[in-house]
Amino acid sequence: MAVAAVKWVMSKRTILKHLFPVQNGALYCVCHKSTYSPLPDDYNCNVELALTSDGRTIVCYHPSVDIPYEHTKPIPRPDPVHNNEETHDQVLKTRLEEKVEHLEEGPMIEQLSKMFFTTKHRWYPHGRYHRCRKNLNPPKDR
């Protein structure tokens, strides 16, 4: 049994050598077409293919090419204060002009009373007299 297994492994290895022969350090496939296609010249990386010493792994090395500073452009960044379009900065932060305005309590209470159809007294805070007399531990309902 052991001899048959060794022969089968040896024969399998020879079959793989015939199916995937190595020529000049590159993998040469007899039965399949290669899917490798050369990249255009203006592509931003150099591709190099290699085979490991045991012949089992194909290694692809593709470092990015350095672009000279003369060929770059600055990223346009619109001013968030004077830009009419809604930007990410405007969504997360209030505009600088709105920060200058002092928020008063009067208009907010009027807006809330109009929005919820209530009187203005509902939105003012309770005084100390009423807060002291509030029962903090009310009895549970049955």
Swiss-Prot record:
<dbReference type="GO" id="GO:0005762">
    <property type="term" value="C:mitochondrial large ribosomal subunit"/>
</dbReference>
<comment type="subunit">
    <text>Component of the mitochondrial large ribosomal subunit (mt-LSU). Mature mammalian 55S mitochondrial ribosomes consist of a small (28S) and a large (39S) subunit. The 28S small subunit contains a 12S ribosomal RNA (12S mt-rRNA) and 30 different proteins. The 39S large subunit contains a 16S rRNA (16S mt-rRNA), a copy of mitochondrial valine transfer RNA (mt-tRNA(Val)), which plays an integral structural role, and 52 different proteins.</text>
</comment>
<keyword id="KW-0496">Mitochondrion</keyword>
<keyword id="KW-0689">Ribosomal protein</keyword>
<dbReference type="GO" id="GO:0032543">
    <property type="term" value="P:mitochondrial translation"/>
</dbReference>
<dbReference type="Pfam" id="PF10210">
    <property type="entry name" value="MRP-S32"/>
</dbReference>
<feature type="transit peptide" description="Mitochondrion">
    <location>
        <begin position="1"/>
        <end position="32"/>
    </location>
</feature>
<dbReference type="InterPro" id="IPR019346">
    <property type="entry name" value="Ribosomal_mL42"/>
</dbReference>
<dbReference type="GO" id="GO:0005739">
    <property type="term" value="C:mitochondrion"/>
</dbReference>
<protein>
    <recommendedName>
        <fullName>Large ribosomal subunit protein mL42</fullName>
    </recommendedName>
</protein>
<dbReference type="GO" id="GO:0006412">
    <property type="term" value="P:translation"/>
</dbReference>
<dbReference type="GO" id="GO:0005763">
    <property type="term" value="C:mitochondrial small ribosomal subunit"/>
</dbReference>
<dbReference type="GO" id="GO:0003723">
    <property type="term" value="F:RNA binding"/>
</dbReference>
<dbReference type="GO" id="GO:0005743">
    <property type="term" value="C:mitochondrial inner membrane"/>
</dbReference>
<dbReference type="GO" id="GO:0003735">
    <property type="term" value="F:structural constituent of ribosome"/>
</dbReference>
<keyword id="KW-0687">Ribonucleoprotein</keyword>
<comment type="similarity">
    <text>Belongs to the mitochondrion-specific ribosomal protein mL42 family.</text>
</comment>
<keyword id="KW-0809">Transit peptide</keyword>
<dbReference type="GO" id="GO:0005886">
    <property type="term" value="C:plasma membrane"/>
</dbReference>
